[in-house]
């Protein structure tokens, strides 16, 4: 019996491409900054267009009576805050520091899952956490000290990962709640 999804390889490839592009997000940020669009304005310029494109759909859903309440907007705000922090951190610190601090998101996700969803991690999650924290220790704890972010860009990258983790855990909780409500109606 094969327990894999029938599109397992396609999904894996798409995730590989998306993660690679996400890791290169800093390049247009730096280019916009070099072109005179400084600070958070570069981030805002990259986010206003999708917001304006999606806004009519939100109004249309509200008009049709198929609004989800505040659940999904809160998730969107958490996720958007995470992306904004991630994008701005590249302008304030070294790229490698921003990437490492942002990509320890699994640490925060695991903590939030344990606290808010009461889910205990499996053994492979512990391996992931050890690897993530080892990377942080290698980059930030070279002098034998506790690895603490050194500047505002580091802290913003760390905060971005926390926001992304919060949005993911909130999405899981909301999806589970909506799924349970749908099963009850049947």
Mark where each language-model region is.
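Structural motif at transmembrane-helix junctions in multi-pass transporters
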Residues: 34-41, 85-101, 176-179
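Hydrophobic transmembrane alpha-helices of multi-pass small-molecule transport proteins
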Residues: 54, 79, 124-142
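C-terminal transmembrane-helix exit sites in multi-pass transporters
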Residues: 53, 58-61, 105-130
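Glycine-/small-residue-enriched transmembrane alpha-helix faces in small-molecule transporters
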Residues: 1-41, 85, 130, 147-172
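Cytoplasmic-side transmembrane-helix entry/capping segments in multi-pass membrane proteins
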Residues: 68-76, 121-132, 154, 179-180
């Amino acid at each position: 019996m094969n327990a894999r999804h029938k599109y397992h390889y396609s999904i894996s490839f798409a995730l590989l491409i998306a993660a690679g592009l996400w890791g290169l997000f800093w390049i247009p940020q730096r280019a916009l900054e070099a072109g005179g669009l400084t600070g958070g304005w570069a981030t805002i310029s990259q986010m206003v267009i999708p917001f304006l494109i999606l806004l009519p759909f939100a109004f249309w859903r509200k008009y049709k009576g198929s609004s989800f309440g505040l659940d999904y907007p809160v998730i969107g705000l958490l996720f958007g805050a995470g992306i904004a922090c991630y994008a701005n951190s590249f302008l304030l610190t070294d790229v490698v520091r921003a990437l490492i601090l942002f990509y320890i998101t699994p640490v925060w996700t695991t903590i939030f899952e344990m606290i808010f969803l009461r889910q205990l991690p499996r053994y492979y999650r512990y391996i992931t956490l050890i690897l993530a924290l080892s990377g942080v220790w290698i980059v930030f704890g070279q002098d034998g000290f506790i690895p603490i972010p050194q500047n505002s860009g580091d802290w913003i990258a760390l905060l971005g990962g926390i926001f992304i983790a919060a949005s993911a855990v909130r999405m899981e909780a909301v999806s589970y709640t909506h799924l349970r409500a749908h099963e009850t109606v049947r």
